[in-house]
C-alpha cells in the first residue's frame, strides 16, 4: 500500500511529527475568525494590489504572541520558521511591509480589528459572565475596570530644556512621568489608559504623554468606549482611589449612566449620620438601606424598628413602632447632595463591598503581566503617538484572542477570576 503526504503551504514537516506545543500553536491560529481581520484588511488595502492582505495582521499576532522584538526580526523569523509561514499563509514580507501596514491602517484600522475580536468574545458570553458573588438585584450590564500603565520610550528621547524650564524631545508625543515613579524613576514615555471587563477582556486603550493625569482622561475614555460599542450596555466601573473626586462620580453617572465604584478615601459625614455613612433616626439609631431608586436618584433608608431590640428604653414614644409596616421610620438621601457620600455606590452598600475585592484581585493579576502586554522593549523604537497606540492595540487584540482560545479549548471564562462554577 502506497501512502501519500499532501504538502501544506509553508509547512516543511509532517504534521504528525509536531510537538504538543507546536500543535497548540497551530490550534491557536485555527481558532482565529477570519471575519475579524479580512474585511478591515481589504478595506485599507490601498490603490495597488492587495498583496499580503490579512496575512500581515496574522504576522503581527505572531510577533506579539512569540515576543519577537522588532519588525526586522519578525521578517527574519517568517523566512526561517515554517510554522510561522504556515499560520500566515506562507508569506515572506520584508520589514518595510509592516511599516506600510501601520501607515495604511493607522490606529483606526487596528481598532476596527480589535472591535471584531471583542464582538466575537461577546458572542461567546465572555464580556459579562455570571458572577455569583454579586447581588442578584444589581444593575444589569458589563462591569468595567479602568487602569493606566506607564510605557517607557526607548528611541529618540534625547531632550533639550528651554528657557522656561520645559523639556522638548525628538518625539514630541512623549514626556516625563511628571513625578518620580517607584520603579522607572524619571523615565520618559507615554501612558496607556485602558478599560477592560471584570473578566479581563480589554475593550479600549488610549495613549497620552506620560505626564497627563488619569483623572483628565477617564471621561474621554468612557465616551470613546460608549461610542465604539453602542450595542453593549455598561453598568459599573471600578476605579482606584486616584479617581476619587466628586466631579468624576457625578459625570460618569449623569453623562453615561454608569455607576462608579471608586476606592474611597476617608470621608467625614454631616450631622445626622454615623461615621460609616448610615443615617440616624430621630432617636439616634442607625438605619439600614432599603432600596436605591436610580430614576429618582435617591436611596431610601428605614429603621426596621431596631429600637424594639434595644435594651435601653426610649426617652420619648416613637409613633412608628405602632405602624404595621415592618420598615418603620423612613428617610431618603439624594445623589445631588454628593455622589461620593450619597451616590448609588457608597462604601456601605452591598454592591460596593462585593466589587471592591475584584479591583484588588484584578490589579494584582494584571500587575504581573502589564510589562508583557504593553512594555516598550528596548529594541522597539516606535515613534509618535500613532505607532505607540498601534503597539498597545496589537497587545489588546492578542489578549482578547488568548481569552477566546482558552475558552474554546478548556471552557475557562476568565484568566483572572475563578468563574467556572
Regions found by a protein language model. Give the residues of each.
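An anionic, glycine-rich sequence signature occurring as long contiguous blocks
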Residues: 254-362, 367-379
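Short, positively charged, Gly/Tyr-enriched micro-motifs
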Residues: 49-120
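Short, charged/polar micro-motifs that form catalytic or ligand-binding hotspots
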Residues: 46-50, 60-68, 88, 208, ...
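Basic, amphipathic alpha-helical segments enriched in Lys/Arg and hydrophobic/aromatic residues
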Residues: 352-421
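Basic, short loop/linker segments at the boundary and entry of helix-turn-helix/winged-helix-like folds
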Residues: 15-66
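Polybasic low-complexity intrinsically disordered regions
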Residues: 49, 76, 107-254, 263-265
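Structural motif
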Residues: 45-55, 182-185, 357, 380-392
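Double-stranded DNA-binding cores of transcription factors and transposases
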Residues: 2-9, 54-56
